[in-house]
């Protein structure tokens, strides 16, 4: 037998769920790296967890290390000896090489060639050794390499960890791993484990991976998180069928309850129907954030959308057979939570949205109050409303009035008691308060949707009306924070400006709105007129970089369009997609290769050209047939009315043939300066015209 199963359990105090889930994804990679570092070829690696333990299971862990050769290269032999024929032995430099390696026999030296030079050389053979002596060092290095964000020290231990470690149990090939002192964490190892707390608090000895799994299974510990998840989902499904309900499975919440349980059980509780007068979001958020409960909905026909049910799913870690006692305890806690929510909500309804003291809340230090921000957004919203009036399906005067009202009350809920308790309900509560105070429904909905999209694939504002309110918020935040120098760098983006910028582009693209990242940014900056001065090109560039996240496409195609003067968001996207369609079409393969080659020559000729230089040319100075042929083909494109971008790109790529012939037969740098200048001016016009679709030299396919 050359290998055996290795199991390592790290027994800890309860691990915080979110920190555990974040780092769990990285654990297999980190363990693989430690094995590779020691040239250990192991079989399949599995890592399991419960809130109280991490378990590393490695199939076919080798009993012996591999025999390895370690090579050392010294100084060139020309400078390592006292004389050239080496008869007088090694000099200080040569001796130093061997002494550094702890070798005393210098008489039988070896040489090797490195970088075409003969140098002193020594090879050290590492014989096979038992791997059992490597296991604890690997485990300790693994623990030290885990990053949970925060760590703590306990007692007089040398190392820190996210929670105190109580034991490391190693089971491998019948070897004895008992009593190994782990000074770093302040304990001696035991080949033992602990089970579910309701089954006992003492260590239970185990002598093999098989025995370990049997002990846990017998004592209500489901080690595999996938099996715990499956148990929860199966029990929820049974409750849905039995009670004719639908349970909303929140993925993040499911992951969390899996991480905080060792033997989960899904139980159905209920709350007083009187609480259903609260907005659904208050109830579901309170259940999720405070109690880790899943929301329950009434089962309806396919034509009807489900309504919130006065029930909830709690996932218990108890193995108590008296389930009703557990349910009753959770119902009591939820009743108190929802009673608080009713109190907060009813208090908020008493406060008119107009009277919210926004001036008392600082937006960002140095950037004024929420009232200042609201006033800046109002100016931006007015500009956008006038610009997009044809898409609003209402008279301009009415649109200005309603959107102005929406912006004025949009931040009022930030000072509400409910949002103070549940910050994720900002905007949502503003919507409910606006409806209760008889605001226009479009106004109320735009307050709710002002923060959309919340993530890359999240919903967008449902109308151009709401889009204007959302864009106003995003544009003001970008102007304000960039003007204050709070620009994202590296992985740091404390104000989520990358997400905010992505949302801006996505909204504009979705509704096909005209927005120029040079002209409109400049106009808005000047119109608001209160931002600290900064280089708008920095913001423009920042927004342009987000196109790489917005469009699923070869980055070089996106780059080719961004390298032109086009700054209209929708047109950039249209050009990128049209180029992609053309380049992805197999029938265009030869055409695109020929054009790439010709365009690069065209770009090289014009690379040092001053854009402000006159580009006038005269056909009368054309001497070669190929000049006339290229001009006629180019002029035909210039005078054509294309149905769309696809046909325009097709036409431009059709210039590959006359361009190739031109460069084969025409000497651009003619001795006659007038002819030379005429040819360069003509080619500059062709080059500039190409830039209407993209900077083709940037494309790499």
From Swiss-Prot:
<dbReference type="InterPro" id="IPR015944">
    <property type="entry name" value="Gly-tRNA-synth_bsu"/>
</dbReference>
<keyword id="KW-0030">Aminoacyl-tRNA synthetase</keyword>
<dbReference type="InterPro" id="IPR006194">
    <property type="entry name" value="Gly-tRNA-synth_heterodimer"/>
</dbReference>
<dbReference type="GO" id="GO:0005524">
    <property type="term" value="F:ATP binding"/>
</dbReference>
<dbReference type="GO" id="GO:0006426">
    <property type="term" value="P:glycyl-tRNA aminoacylation"/>
</dbReference>
<keyword id="KW-0436">Ligase</keyword>
<keyword id="KW-0547">Nucleotide-binding</keyword>
<keyword id="KW-0648">Protein biosynthesis</keyword>
<comment type="similarity">
    <text>Belongs to the class-II aminoacyl-tRNA synthetase family.</text>
</comment>
<dbReference type="Pfam" id="PF02092">
    <property type="entry name" value="tRNA_synt_2f"/>
</dbReference>
<keyword id="KW-0963">Cytoplasm</keyword>
<keyword id="KW-0067">ATP-binding</keyword>
<protein>
    <recommendedName>
        <fullName>Glycine--tRNA ligase beta subunit</fullName>
        <ecNumber>6.1.1.14</ecNumber>
    </recommendedName>
</protein>
<dbReference type="GO" id="GO:0004820">
    <property type="term" value="F:glycine-tRNA ligase activity"/>
</dbReference>
<dbReference type="GO" id="GO:0005829">
    <property type="term" value="C:cytosol"/>
</dbReference>
<comment type="subunit">
    <text>Tetramer of two alpha and two beta subunits.</text>
</comment>
């Amino acid at each position: 037998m050359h290998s055996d199963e290795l199991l390592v359990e790290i027994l800890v105090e309860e691990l915080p769920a979110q920190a555990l889930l974040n780092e769990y994804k990285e654990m297999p990679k980190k363990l693989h790296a430690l094995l590779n570092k020691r040239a250990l070829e192991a079989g399949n690696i599995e890592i399991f967890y419960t809130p109280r333990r991490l378990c590393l299971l490695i199939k076919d862990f080798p009993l012996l290390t591999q025999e390895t050769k370690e090579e050392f290269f010294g100084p060139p032999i020309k400078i390592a000896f006292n004389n050239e024929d080496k008869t007088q032995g090694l000099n200080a430099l040569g001796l130093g090489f061997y002494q550094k390696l702890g070798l005393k026999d210098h008489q039988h030296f070896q040489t090797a060639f490195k970088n075409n030079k003969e140098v002193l050389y020594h090879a050290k053979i590492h014989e096979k050794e038992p791997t059992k002596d490597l296991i604890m060092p690997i485990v300790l290095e693994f623990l030290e390499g885990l990053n949970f964000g925060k760590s703590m020290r306990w007692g007089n231990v040398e190392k820190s960890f996210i929670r105190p470690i109580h034991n490391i149990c190693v089971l491998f090939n019948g070897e004895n791993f008992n009593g190994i002192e782990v000074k770093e964490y302040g304990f001696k190892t035991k080949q033992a484990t602990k089970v579910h707390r309701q089954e006992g608090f003492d260590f239970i000895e185990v002598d093999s991976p098989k025995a370990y799994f049997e002990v846990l299974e017998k004592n209500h510990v489901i080690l595999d998180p996938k099996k715990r998840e499956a148990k929860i989902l199966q029990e929820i499904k049974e409750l849905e069928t039995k009670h004719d309900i639908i349970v909303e499975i929140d993925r993040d919440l499911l992951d969390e309850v899996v991480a905080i349980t060792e033997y989960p059980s899904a139980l159905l509780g209920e709350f007083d129907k009187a609480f259903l007068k609260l907005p659904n979001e208050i109830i579901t958020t309170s259940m999720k954030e405070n109690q880790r409960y899943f929301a329950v909905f009434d089962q309806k026909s396919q034509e009807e959308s489900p309504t919130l049910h006065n029930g909830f799913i709690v996932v218990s870690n108890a193995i108590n057979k008296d389930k009703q006692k557990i349910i009753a305890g959770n119902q009591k806690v939820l009743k108190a939570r929802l009673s608080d929510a009713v109190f907060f909500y009813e208090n908020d309804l008493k406060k008119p949205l107009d009277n919210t003291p926004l001036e008392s809340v600082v937006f960002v230090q140095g950037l004024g109050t929420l009232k200042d921000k609201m006033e800046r957004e109002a100016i931006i919203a007015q500009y956008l409303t006038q610009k997009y009036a044809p898409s609003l399906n209402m008279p301009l005067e009415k649109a200005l009035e309603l959107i102005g009202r929406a912006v004025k009350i949009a931040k009022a809920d930030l000072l509400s008691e409910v949002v103070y308790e549940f910050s994720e309900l900002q905007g949502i509560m503003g919507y409910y308060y606006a409806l209760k105070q008889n605001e226009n429904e479009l106004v109320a909905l735009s307050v709710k949707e002002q923060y959309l999209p919340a993530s890359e694939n999240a919903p967008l504002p449902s109308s151009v009306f709401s889009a204007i309110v959302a864009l106003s918020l995003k544009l003001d935040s970008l102007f304000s924070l960039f003007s204050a120098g709070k620009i994202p760098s590296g992985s740091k983006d404390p104000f989520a400006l990358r997400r905010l910028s992505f949302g801006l582009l996505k909204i504009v693209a979705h509704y096909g709105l005209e927005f120029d990242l040079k002209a409109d940014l400049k106009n808005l900056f000047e119109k608001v007129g209160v931002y600290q001065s900064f280089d708008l090109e920095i913001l423009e560039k920042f927004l342009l970089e987000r196109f790489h996240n917005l469009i699923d496409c070869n980055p070089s195609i996106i780059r080719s369009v961004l390298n032109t003067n086009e700054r209209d968001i929708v047109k950039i996207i249209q050009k990128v997609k049209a180029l992609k369609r053309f380049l992805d079409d197999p029938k265009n393969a030869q055409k695109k290769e020929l054009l790439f080659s010709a365009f690069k020559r065209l770009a090289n000729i014009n690379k040092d050209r001053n854009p402000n230089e006159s580009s006038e040319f005269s056909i009368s100075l054309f001497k070669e047939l190929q000049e006339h042929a290229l001009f006629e083909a180019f002029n035909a494109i210039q005078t054509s009315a294309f149905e769309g971008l696809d046909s325009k790109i097709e036409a431009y790529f059709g210039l590959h043939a006359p361009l190739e012939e031109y460069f084969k037969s025409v000497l651009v740098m003619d001795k006659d300066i007038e002819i030379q200048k005429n040819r360069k001016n003509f080619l500059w016009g062709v080059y500039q015209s190409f830039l209407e679709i993209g900077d083709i030299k940037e494309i790499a396919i």
